[in-house]
Amino acid sequence: MSKIKDDVKKQIEKRRTFAIISHPDAGKTTLTEKFLLYGGAINQAGSVKGKATSKHAVSDWMEIEKERGISVTSSVLQFNYGGYCINILDTPGHQDFSEDTYRTLMAADSAVMVIDASKGVEAQTRKLFKVCTMRHIPIFTFINKMDREAMDTFELLDDIENELGIATCPVNWPIGSGKEFRGVYDRATKSVELFSDTRKGTTQGEVQIVPIDDPSLNGLISEEQKAKLEEEIELQDGAGAELDQEMVSKGELSPVFFGSALTNFGVETFLKHFLKMTTSPLPRKSDKGEIDPMEEGEFSAFVFKIQANMNKAHRDRIAFMRICSGEFEAGMDVFHMQGGKKVRLSQPQQMMASERHMVDKAYGGDIIGVFDPGIFSIGDTLTTSSDKFSYEGIPTFAPEHFARVRQVDTMKRKQFIKGINQIAQEGAIQIFQEFNTGMEEIVVGVVGVLQFDVLKYRLENEYNVDIRLENLPYEYIRWIDNPQDFDLAKLSGTSDMKKVKDLKDRPLLLFVNEWSIRMTQERNDGLVLTEFAR
């Protein structure tokens, strides 16, 4: 381990790397775009929904995302604002892609949770919040869509605390909602921030700041709004939790902000507060203990995402890695721990969704993409340290839906095998082979059924292969942990059990129900089954 240089440390201290999570349609992608607008990364914000002639969201780059208006992959976006270098990881909102979201959260130091003001905490928010708590990262809440009819502010805060089990502390307070949404009250400065027209959110707009006790405020908001604001603030100040930065850092208390991403109201206010309150890159667990980016001078990173064919013209494969320590330089040689050899990281690039630009240098906290000739896997560690180590692995979700997949045109077998293998290596699907059949019979497992649609779409559009999917009745998957103790051909199970193997030749069993699992274990004394591959 080598000591960090002062100039590298200063660069790392500027980094803020966070993920944005939400239930579908809470406004996550719109909020991401507005951050880019304020950071000067785009001149005019597009909207996810709208007329066919409208721009598509900057972070939705895959064709199927543009067609459906949902994010099905995690986009990586970088921009500068207020002296900070910001890396945003925009995650899929749809529950069928929760595995991709989990991997993305592994690369984040904090999370922004977007909640629809009219609906409160929704199903997918709960699931994603659980993943955040497993990582013990700070969680900041942006209550969105205040320009529409909203739940009572106290009800929203109670909903977050009761549903998610986390304390809340509103940093600001909304003034009205729906058509009467005028701005927010900043509790720290005791001033009101009033928002101007932003041309339906396509431009930044101006903010007028007025102290709460300034007489001029009476002409800017109604007497009723002012009286209600003063009453609610008095109640909150008397009964609410104080803003405890240590609790925030541990993920035990969530600072809450209100606004409207669509109209830009409250977005820049949130961004400014968030960047000051959130953390610079955090230490990471490895098999040699924690690696602290503020102390470790050697370069280290781990792969959290692999994506093929981001641009049809390139036909390449990019491995996205989170730099955890040190300084990256283009063309540098690093040791690939899982491959057991040195590799050169070529064509390093940073992304604005599908737009890419080459980078010469990057630092701890940054996300970069490098050309992958097919040697990297999700969770791999790369380092220049002579004291070699591996970062904690990224677990694989057990698939819950299965289908047999065949290509329609037998002459396109080569493209089919290449395509399905590449998509599997990205972690979007898991593929299994039946015993003694090679790749003739392929079974695909996914966490959510929408992933089958994405698989079909991508094979057709990126590899020019039409496929047929035959849904299978299996719901449970178990890897055999001790295959050396059994003759797998003679393994006795229920009639609806299926024997398959994964891409690493590890044997596993598919079951229709839990009864079949119990019966198989009873008939094969000593058989050890696990939900995850080891």
Role assignments for model-derived ranges:
Residues 1-534:
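Structural and coupling elements of P-loop NTPases
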